[in-house]
């Protein structure tokens, strides 16, 4: 609340206070269980405002039980991934190797997101929608970082600032024009390792092959 009052989050709070949320999409979290007072405060204050709650999970979590739609996620051994164990005491990423294909209708999160991207593009075309605005771009904080001084952005300009995108481009943006395949995360994991090396998170001699053989990787 203090940060909001002081304006430190100006331009980053989306949606604004005047916009009532309509859809809550939850992936990799269980807010009704993990947040303090979740089953009381959230169910009483937030849930009645929502038209749809969608949860992605491999089990019937507390949040899933209160969701309108539950998308069954693949379990740990049904997809290839890194398990991030992050704390001041544990500085390792564990490598999770796929042992079997997803059971039943379950899918990996990556597969789900690709499917949603294609569906959004298709439904937008069916409804005659072409463009949408991404709320990034000129903000007081960015102006101060680049110019050394903050600029006051008139309220009338705020809706048109940001990046203009097209709905039909969403699938290609997600896969970087087909570089990443929905059915194979090999290239994405390799690039993840390389970007971590570039940022100094992993040591320079690391590679996906070495991490696979070792089963884990230490990060800085």
Predicted regions and their residues:
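Long, low-complexity segments enriched in small/aliphatic residues
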Residues: 144-220
């Amino acid at each position: 609340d203090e940060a909001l009052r002081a304006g430190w989050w100006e331009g980053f709070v989306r949606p604004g206070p005047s916009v009532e949320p309509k859809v809550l999409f939850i992936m990799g979290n269980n807010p009704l269980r993990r947040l303090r007072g979740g089953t009381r405060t959230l169910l009483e204050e937030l849930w009645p405002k929502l038209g749809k709650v969608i949860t992605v999970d491999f089990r019937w979590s507390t949040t899933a039980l209160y969701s309108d739609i539950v998308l069954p996620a693949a379990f740990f051994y049904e997809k290839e991934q890194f398990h991030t164990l992050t704390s001041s005491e544990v500085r390792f990423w564990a490598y999770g190797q796929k042992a079997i294909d997803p059971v039943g209708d379950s899918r990996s999160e990556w597969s789900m997101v690709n499917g949603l991207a294609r569906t959004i593009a298709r439904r937008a075309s069916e409804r005659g929608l072409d463009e949408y605005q991404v709320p990034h771009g000129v903000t007081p904080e960015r102006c101060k970082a680049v110019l050394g001084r903050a600029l006051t952005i008139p309220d009338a300009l705020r809706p048109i600032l940001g990046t203009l995108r097209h709905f039909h481009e969403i699938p290609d943006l997600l896969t970087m024009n087909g570089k990443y395949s929905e059915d194979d995360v090999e290239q994405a994991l390799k690039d993840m390792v390389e970007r971590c090396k570039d940022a100094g998170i992993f040591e320079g001699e690391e590679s996906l092959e070495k991490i696979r053989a070792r089963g884990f990787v230490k990060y800085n």
